[in-house]
A protein has these predicted regions:
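Extended catalytic-interface subdomain
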Residues: 33-44, 62-65, 87, 121-155, ...
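Primarily recognizes the serine-hydrolase "nucleophile elbow" in alpha/beta-hydrolase
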Residues: 39-105, 130
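Alpha-helix capping and helix-loop boundary segments enriched in small/acidic/polar residues
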Residues: 25-32, 62-63, 73, 128-136, ...
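Mobile cap/lid helix-loop segments that gate and shape the active-site cleft of serine hydrolases
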Residues: 50, 87-141, 162-170, 178-183
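Conserved strand-to-loop "acid loop" that flanks and positions the catalytic carboxylate
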Residues: 146-164, 192-193
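Solvent-exposed loop/turn segments at secondary-structure junctions
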Residues: 2-5, 67-69, 91-93, 156-159, ...
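C-terminal catalytic histidine-bearing segment of alpha/beta-hydrolase fold enzymes
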Residues: 171-172, 176-223
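Cap/lid segment of the alpha/beta-hydrolase catalytic domain
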Residues: 1-57, 94, 98-100
Length: 223
């Protein structure tokens, strides 16, 4: 997925496959372009068909941790063919609300993030207290996954991840699932005591329950 768009700051913006296809959109951030790439992969799987791929495109899940946790969340939000999204420790720009992160210290907030991952205009327009002028925030990004399944995983041992900003974002987003009476399709878990991007045993049952229920169509308790 990294090959679709800009991965690190020293990689020149506008020189990746997405940018060559859509040069007028070169100011887009990498996350929207990576999500576009995932959608094209799903297009290919659907075109080839299950006989060739042995993949049921009605049961596609996407997951990732850290920057890839952000990537998973964007992919799940923007493609309705993704049945299950599991975003592990996605940090700022993932599930954490920018407005809340601005009130915290030592976290990935809008003034301290990798701007090659987002629109170039974001820092110029919404730096400092201007963050409160954002027309949207990331509880809405999470809610875009609804009515499909979403699981958010946090790790409070890494302050940079801004789980204090992810929690209210997740709580706000889950109200959308609750409104439709499908609250079993969304959950979140914040557990410490383990390295970054390592799934602890305490979270494994919840992860397995989401996989069982939304990818394998088995009975499982997700709330």
């Amino acid at each position: 997925m990294n090959d679709y768009s800009q991965w690190r700051p020293h990689h020149e913006r506008g020189q990746h496959p997405f940018d060559r296809l859509y040069p007028q959109l070169k100011d887009n951030g990498a996350y929207s372009e990576w999500a576009w790439g995932l959608s094209r992969l799903v297009d290919g799987l659907q075109k080839l068909g299950p006989e060739a791929t042995r993949i049921d495109t009605e049961r596609i899940g996407v997951t990732g941790c850290s920057y890839a946790g952000k990537m998973a969340l964007y992919c799940g939000a923007f493609d309705e063919r993704i049945a299950l999204t599991i975003a592990q420790e996605p940090g700022g720009g993932g599930a954490a609300a920018w407005r809340v992160s601005h009130t915290l210290t030592e976290v990935e907030d809008l003034d301290h993030t990798d701007y090659h991952w987002f629109m170039e205009s974001m820092r110029e327009n919404f730096h400092g207290d201007s963050v409160y002028q954002l027309p949207y925030d990331h509880h809405q990004l999470c809610a875009m996954v609804c009515p499909r399944a979403l699981l958010l995983l946090g790790n409070p041992d890494y302050k940079w991840l801004a789980d204090e900003a992810m929690l209210p974002s997740a709580q706000a987003a889950e109200k959308v699932w609750q409104k439709f009476g499908i609250e079993d399709r969304m959950n979140y878990s914040i557990v410490g005591g383990h390295p970054h991007c390592m799934l602890p045993e305490s979270q494994m049952p919840l992860v397995q329950a989401f996989i069982d229920k939304f990818l394998l169509h088995r009975d499982a308790k997700t709330r």
